[in-house]
């Protein structure tokens, strides 16, 4: 309910452009030493409660995970903010298609799209919803900079958090032998992330280059055209939006997106 009030406040300040993603907690329960509990049920209940609250409705909820008694934000006005459910797997996607305005995928890669979009279609049909009314957003890393090597170094540094570098994320881009090297050296990627270094010890540069290409948008301005083609492929598959994760020097990154990337997408 605090999320609901916060995003409603943002929505009012932003003239109806507010939005929020509610997920199952990601890595945070593990970091905090907490049990993940009923992630799908809890996330679905949270999304449903927030949806009611941001519309100014009375929230009376007696769920398996959350409970509320007669909560109401009487001050909200205008078009409600967009409420996404963060989801990648089939159960979370089913929940998202039931309760949310849309879903945000995390680091979705092209080889995953056919199966994932199948889950979306199944969920929408199951819950009697139209695809045109459901937003599909892919969260992806944007590292494009004026200096190509700086961009690639940053992308290598952040690689461990691309799907937490689990096998389904890296195996499609590597040979079995290369995938085995990555699987045996995940700690090197974590060390690079923690020390803010682009040096992945024990992993050949050519393997790192394949991962950067497959799991992020990196390079300089000359690389934008091929990244645009990838984004268009996502769009053709049904993705309606992309959330670009910025890193170092976000001001310059925003300028690159506005002045260089968006004109290419139009």
Language-model regions: role of each:
Residues 46-49, 53, 257-266:
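Alpha-helix-loop-beta-strand connector modules within alpha/beta enzyme cores
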């Amino acid at each position: 309910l605090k999320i609901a009030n916060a995003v409603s406040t943002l929505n009012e300040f932003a003239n109806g452009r507010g939005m929020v993603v509610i997920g199952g907690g990601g890595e945070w329960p593990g970091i905090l030493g907490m049990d993940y509990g009923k992630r799908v049920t809890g996330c679905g209940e949270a999304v449903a409660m927030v949806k009611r609250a941001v519309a100014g409705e009375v929230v009376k909820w007696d769920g398996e995970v959350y409970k509320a008694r007669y909560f109401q934000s009487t001050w909200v006005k205008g078009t409600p903010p967009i409420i996404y459910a963060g989801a990648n797997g089939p159960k979370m996607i089913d929940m998202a298609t039931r309760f949310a305005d849309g879903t945000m995928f995390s680091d979705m890669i092209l080889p995953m799209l056919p199966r994932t979009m199948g889950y979306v279609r199944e969920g929408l049909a199951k819950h009697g919803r139209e695809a045109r009314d459901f937003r599909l957003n892919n969260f992806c890393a944007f590292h494009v900079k004026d200096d190509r090597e700086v961009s690639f170094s940053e992308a290598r540094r952040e690689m461990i958090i691309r799907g937490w570098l689990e096998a389904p994320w890296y195996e499609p881009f590597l040979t079995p032998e290369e995938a085995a090297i990555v699987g045996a050296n995940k700690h090197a990627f974590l060390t690079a992330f923690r020390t803010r270094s682009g040096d992945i010890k024990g992993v050949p540069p050519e393997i790192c280059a394949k991962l950067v290409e497959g799991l992020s948008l990196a390079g300089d301005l000359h690389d934008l055209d091929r990244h645009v083609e990838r984004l268009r492929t996502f769009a053709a598959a049904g993705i309606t939006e992309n959330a670009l994760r910025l890193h170092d020097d976000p001001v310059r990154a925003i300028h690159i997106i506005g002045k260089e990337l968006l004109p290419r997408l139009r």
